[in-house]
Amino acid sequence: MTKQTLSFQAEVAQLLHLVTHSLYSNKEIFLRELISNASDACDKLRYEAINDSGLYEDAPTLEVRVSFDPAAKTLTISDNGIGMSAQEAIDHLGTIAKSGTKDFVSKLSGDQKADSQLIGQFGVGFYSGFIVADKITVESRRAGMKASEGVRWISGGAGDFEVETIERAARGTSVILHLRDDAMDYCSAWKLKSIINKYSDHISLPILMEKEEWKDGELINPSDEKGGRQPGGMVKTGEWETVNKGNAIWARAKKDITPEQYTEFYKQISHDFEAPLAYTHNRVEGSTEYTQLLYLPSKAPMDLFNREKSAGVKLYVKRVFIMDDAEALLPTYLRFVKGVVDSADLPLNVSRELLQESRDVKAIREGCTKRVLGMLEDLAKHDKLPAPSADGGTDTTAGVSDVLSEEDKANEGKYSKFYAEFGAVLKEGLGEDYANKDRLAKLLRFASSSTDTVSVSFADYKARMKEGQEAIYYITADTPAAAKNSPQLEVFKKKGIEVLLMTDRVDEWALNYLQEFDGTPLQSVAKGAVDLGKLQDEAEKKAAEEAAETFKPLLAKLKEALKDKAEDVRVTTRLVDSPACLVVQDHGMSTQLARMLKQAGQAAPDVKPVLEVNAEHPLVKKLDGSVHFNDLAHILFDQALLAEGGLPADPAAYVKRVNALLV
């Protein structure tokens, strides 16, 4: 391949600009990122070589080398891992293959501090080299390819890069950073070693640097042995030494690992700048033996709701890396969890297909799921914010609390923070994980009609139900305001009955799998006829029956006028101030869920709701004798639709009818 000049993907160009201008406060993370990439490349070679040992060529010992040259102003990170072909260099270094990239770029504000945090949350990997370099040269050869098929990639971090074929005998990749003048302090063995010890000490591969020793300066006067000397300095000996412990952190005893080391390992595997919210480290022995080190992030990634995204758990077998995104190790609703699972029982050549079928993997999955749920239960118990926690469940994860913290204060508010970030995806578990459905239900939190500030669990709600109340009432809506001001809540507010307000897109789908909590049924206030049971007195019931009989002719006329829109029309006792509202049958799909499915491009049935009218409202009383009956009937229906967050099927016709009545 002759030298080519190619353009970066648009998102990469913007990211590079921000990397060079926003991450000034924590420059040294570039070394962590590049060493992590080098380690991953060696892990991938080790995995591919399971089926083809020839890929090791004449260098079976995998390692990462860090070297510097003050005269040339370069810092080089090399590995003898899998390497890259020319096309792979173009694909991997010229584009960002991560999902959510455009979403990421759209959220960048230009505020350096805010963008720095956002970039850290996204993870910049290789591009972090431009924090300290004004040019990067990458030389690589893929394992198994000829020496003549090496590749050189060069970029100054602007809008384009050069790529050409070179002769390269060594397998693997060298990333050569051409340092900026203000980054020359990274040409210091002491500084580089301190950064490696801080961020990459746990890398299981040896990280090598050239050994240095002190050398006195030359005599100013060679004939005077006792005279003065030129300044001495450290000089390279030509030997290489290992500068990291090279011990996988999860294989060490918990007592030998500091919280800071746990945090740095999390940052290395997740490429997150923020510390994790909580973690759990455990070795499981028995019929299936494995070690798990699992983390809860502090912030949700931008692609959290992409169910096809890569999982966050790395799989090792006897400390040999197998795969990055082992989705079989945790259910999809826990896709936000990061960490490592190291199995002693799986074969080294395990495939994704085998993972789906393996009994050992099933046991690991169940164990990891219980461990994560136990961690969440522990956080919920110790959450001292005003939001009460669901209590009464059994924490089957022994020892989690001592992993998290000995002090309740250390966990104060953590569950509330977790739930604000990940609560919506946790609800997916109701439909995916039947075995843990009850545990998940205790972890859910919702807004309430009784308070503007406190999130409420099902257990909290049940503990303060009114005497004679037979159900947990809830409403689903597009927004908190739409839920709180919904006409369907009017009678509940009048009687002081609490209603849970559910506004996550997943809520209605999830509650299809949860019909009751601790023996108490869940009842949507927007489905079926309102039945308050013992909370409705006999006088109210009698008045409702009489109104239904009195209004029979009017209801028949309304039903005829709205036959294309409404399944039925009936008198209701649920309304106090509003003239009408829409509900669906007990087991029908709500209009909100139908709208959501259609917006997502999925097939959804046309829902014909039931129109319920308030017999005491002046507008309803006026209907029967009005010459504008037909227009008023349609306006009544469309206003009820608007009140629940929907839109009239024909907005222009609605406006025309309203205007006609106004003049």
Curated annotation (Swiss-Prot):
Matching InterPro entries: HATPase_C_sf (IPR036890), Heat_shock_protein_90_CS (IPR019805), HSP90_C (IPR037196), Hsp90_fam (IPR001404), Hsp90_N (IPR020575), Ribosomal_Su5_D2-typ_SF (IPR020568)
Record's subcellular location: Cytoplasm
Broad class of where this protein is predominantly found: cytoplasm
Pfam family, one: HSP90
Subunit structure: Homodimer.
Region (Disordered): 218-237
Residues covered by region (C): 596-663
Record keyword Cell cycle present: no
Region (A): 1-352
Molecular-function GO terms, alphabetical: ATP binding; ATP hydrolysis activity; ATP-dependent protein folding chaperone; unfolded protein binding
Name of the coding gene: htpG
KW ATP-binding (keyword) present: yes
HAMAP family in the record: HSP90
GO cellular component: cytoplasm
Family: Belongs to the heat shock protein 90 family.
Coiled coil regions in record: none
Function: Molecular chaperone. Has ATPase activity.
NCBIfam families from the UniProt entry: PRK05218.1
Record keywords: ATP-binding, Chaperone, Cytoplasm, Nucleotide-binding, Stress response
Species name: Albidiferax ferrireducens (strain ATCC BAA-621 / DSM 15236 / T118) (Rhodoferax ferrireducens)
Compositional bias per record (Basic and acidic residues), positions renumbered to this chain: 218-228
Name of the featured protein: Chaperone protein HtpG
Stretch list, region B: 353-595
